[in-house]
Amino acid sequence: MDSEAFQHARDLLDLNFQSLAMKHMDLKQMELDTAAAKVDELTKQLESLWSDSPAPPGAQAGVPSRMARYSTSPVPEHFGSRGSPQKIATDGIEARFGRSESAPSLHPYSPLSPKGRPSSPRTPIYLQPDTYSSLDRAPSPRPRAFDGAGSPHGRAPSPRPGIGPVRQPGPSTPFDYLGRAGSPRGSPLAEGPQAFFPERGPSPRPPAAAYDTAGTFGSPLLGAGGSAFTPPLRAQDDSTLRRRPPKAWNESDLDVAYEKKSSQTASYERLDVFTRPASPGLQLLPWRESSLDGLGASGKDHLTSATLPRNYKVSPLASDRRSDVGSYRRSLGSAGPSGTLPRSWQPVSRIPMPPSSPQPRSTPRQRPIPLSMIFKLQNAFWEHGAGRAVLPGSPIFSRAPPPKLPPQPPPQPQMQPQPQPQPQMQPQSQAQPQTPAPQQTWSPMNEGLLKSPAELEPEPELEVLLAPVEEAGDADEGTVTRPLSPTRLQPALPPEAQTVPELEEVARVLAEIPRPLKRRGSMEQSPAVALPPTHKKQYQQIINRLFHRHGGPGPGGPEPELSTITEGSEARAGPPAPAPPAPIPPPAPPQSSPPEQPQSMEMRSVLRKVGSPRKARRARLNPLVLLLDAALTGELDVVQQAVKEMNDPSQPNEEGITALHNAICGANYPIVDFLIAAGANVNSPDSHGWTPLHCAASCNDTAICTALVQHGAAIFATTLSDGATAIEKCDPYREGYADCATYLADVEQSMGLMHNGVVYALWDYSAEFGDELSFREGESVTVLRRDGPEETDWWWASLHGQEGYVPRNYFGLFPRVKSQRSKI
């Protein structure tokens, strides 16, 4: 009984539905007849207006007027009724399933229809809860209906495949797209001309077919100009629907007229009417870098000015319609609205162009300047390698710039520091106005060394050093000057670099690079510069000449050399070794040296008298200065001797630079191996946060990177200036980039996966929250999860039976083994 009653009720409901549907079809037929009559009347009026002109121009020129009249018609005909391209029966079926807005009887039957497809931009008002099942993709940044809208057939794929054959010949695709893909924030559609291209979410593979077809305007049903994708004004959209129905009207004359109106000339006129207001804001052309430039200059500050892939389209009101997508894109790490997409989403076949909109930091480019470009600006012969091929011996002198390199006048840096060393020297130096040739080699060096970093011009020491050497051509050729430490040197740019437009950006990047890289960047110079002879054992020869007897130079030579070198080295070393300068000139020698110098030329030293029972203290160079300089120049024996005299081989200078930094930047592999074996800290950062691994990565030196990683280098250590890891410092414009970047990427991926997820703590860490783990240096931690959405910098790990979050940048793939070396 229940089933029979249910069947009876269902039949009754079907009958009621059919009767109401027939009534609705009759209503639609009446509306259609009214529209046809109005069309006939308007056609007659247009024919009477254009009777004086030839027929074809009249037919073509009549289209805009007809479109305007239809768009402003007071008859309550909406998109579904006026633009229906189907037959009468088909239109009735469409109307039964919710194609009309004007029929008030639509609402009681909308819940019964699972195929409701509203076509108005304001359709969310009429949607019932049941219809959301097929329209839940409306707010999506990738509406499916839009893919079909740009297809060659001009067909919008329906959520239900059964309705497809009925809607196949219809040209009302743009309005289905407006209906289904319209966001609840769709009110800006009527404010002005705009391109209704959705700002897609950051998908790595956006569908290219729909955009390519629309971008090239190759659709056969969209007219010659692709007018269906022009800014969607309602008048234009209504005329688009009424302009190209294949078979909708019964009047054959009107059919022929409408077929003529769909020619190219009519579409051109329509483009002139509707696309000109939109052209200043957005050019509907295939995507180019200039499109983004145009957008940046139009004053749309809220637009994302990033370099988008080729398949992306941009809308002037993209942030209004897709603000959620924009916020998601901005949350991916960009500093502001001008940030770029992540590197993995950028097209690899194109170099991204910098946007023209003002940047927050007023920097003209989005990605950092490669080191090779900076090296090229520092040295005009970087590409040719002329300096390295011609200049022999140790590279310390080959790094010297020509005397007239800086734009500042060179005599002033030489003459200003003259009063500085005089008060520090003993009376013996003040009483010697006339000095022989060897003093001319050492005195200017002392002047440059005693200058404070604030007074230093770009590398004035080398500049001061070269000028007297050229003047003293008759001096002893065996005299070898002591090489300078890179710790006090500043970057110097050649004259041709002044014409580079990115000079300010280069200077900013240079200020963030550690001194060893700056020093390494000026290695090769012009071979035409006259340089003094170079030798491998420079330090040993200097020490032998200073502290051992031999009959080469006169008595006046060693006297200024001794005091000057000592004071210069101690001034360079600064606070670490303040004691040696005081006892170097004993009280007795200064009393005897002023009268003895003009009288007797037999004296070879001022340290002690011949036959003196007291053994005078010898001058001693700071081992830190020796270590830093020898590590850069590649003198392993000097490095070994200096390390023996130091407690810590990783002792930094005032800028945090260690001997390991210098050895890596100088590509001195034996010294790197020796320092690591001696217990040097492979994670010692300088004042900019650059670890030795950053320096090795910037040189694309895979061998040194491997050695550092295997001895406990921190893979995820970041710099202070830009927060970059080692892999981000690899130079893509230099040889070895692929190998070095691949190795570092493999190491990053292996962290927490290799060795059963075991990583080794490189520093101590105290937990700040309850879900974190505390650990000490050297402890092994097992990583349990590292790919969570909130675990980019924190990994879930276990230690001593407890689980919690640990910072990934505190760990290395291998432990750092400290050498048990005792001081000698």
UniProtKB/Swiss-Prot annotation:
Residue stretches of each ANK repeat: 655-684, 688-717
Residues modified to Phosphothreonine: T123, T275, T307, T340
Residues bearing the modification N-acetylmethionine: M1
Chain intervals for the UniProt region annotation (Disordered): 48-87, 99-271, 291-370, 388-501, 547-614
Gene3D superfamilies, per the entry: Ankyrin repeat-containing domain
One GO MF term attached to the UniProt entry: identical protein binding
Compositional bias per record (Low complexity), positions renumbered to this chain: 359-370, 425-440
Phosphoserine modifications at: 84, 100, 102, 110, 113, 119-120, 134, 183, 187, 203, 279, 315, 331, 338, 522, 563, 593
Tissue and organ expression note: Most abundant in skin with high levels also found in heart, testis and stomach. In 15.5 dpc embryonic heart, expressed at higher levels in atria than ventricles.
Gene Ontology, cellular component aspect: cell junction; cytosol; intercellular bridge; nucleus
Residue ranges of every copy of the SH3 domain listed in the record: 754-816
Compartmental location: Cytoplasm; Nucleus
Name of the protein: RelA-associated inhibitor
Organism: Mus musculus (Mouse)
